[in-house]
UniProtKB/Swiss-Prot annotation:
Protein name: Pyridoxal 5'-phosphate synthase subunit PdxT
Family statement: Belongs to the glutaminase PdxT/SNO family.
Catalytic activity: aldehydo-D-ribose 5-phosphate + D-glyceraldehyde 3-phosphate + L-glutamine = pyridoxal 5'-phosphate + L-glutamate + phosphate + 3 H2O + H(+); L-glutamine + H2O = L-glutamate + NH4(+)
Protein's gene: pdxT
Keyword terms: Glutamine amidotransferase, Hydrolase, Lyase, Pyridoxal phosphate
Protein's GO biological process: glutamine catabolic process; pyridoxal phosphate biosynthetic process; pyridoxine metabolic process
UniProt keyword Nucleus present: no
Length: 189
């Protein structure tokens, strides 16, 4: 395993499974911090945008002065569920685009309501065995730009993609005991 002990990875701590993301980061040997203030972004080598509700997360980012700084943050980012929506440059249904860091078009709540949540083994490019993907009111990617690499699909829908050092993940890897998706982010450091 690579040595990530000299790196600090932040988890945007406005909504979502912040503690679970921090545990996965620490399980790989990196330092993890909950990010609530814009000044904390300067300490980071990478960032996780967790799940939650994307419109509410944007309002909270704006209220905390984080939104404009996150638009220019150019270090590795993993966006999970609502974090994927924050990274997209187009959102079906007219929702305002947020950080627009990836050339992807997304459909919010594409897998249904909370009651429709599920876990499934998912084949992920670069991983030696299926990943136990947890989908909760998950979005999916309907279109990708030419510089976007599709890493996983579920039933013909893109659910994990990479553009440069940005990762958009429709499912919740932090809700499993499998840290391989987080390791993909840390491998960018």
């Amino acid at each position: 395993m690579a040595d990530y002990s000299r790196y600090t990875v932040g988890v945007l701590a406005l909504q979502g499974a912040v503690t679970e993301h921090i545990s996965q980061i620490e399980s790989l040997g990196a330092k993890a911090i909950a990010v609530k203030q814009v000044e904390q972004l300067n300490q980071l080598d990478a960032l996780v945008l967790p799940g939650g509700e994307s419109t509410a997360m944007r309002r909270l980012m704006e209220a905390n002065g984080l939104f404009e700084r996150l638009k220019t943050f150019d270090k590795p980012i993993l966006g999970t569920c609502a974090g994927l929506i924050l990274l997209a440059d187009e959102i079906i249904g007219g929702e305002q685009v947020h950080l627009a860091k990836m050339a992807i078009k997304v459909q919010r709540n594409a897998f249904g309501r909370q009651i429709d949540s599920f876990q499934t083994p998912l084949t992920v490019s670069g991983l030696d065995k299926p990943f136990p993907a947890v989908f909760i009111r998950a979005p999916y990617i309907t279109e990708v730009g030419e510089n976007v690499e599709v890493l996983a699909e579920w039933q013909g829908n893109v659910v994990l993609a990479k553009q440069g050092h940005f990762f958009a993940c429709a499912f919740h890897p932090e809700l499993t005991n499998d840290n391989r998706i987080m390791a993909l982010l840390l491998a960018q450091l």
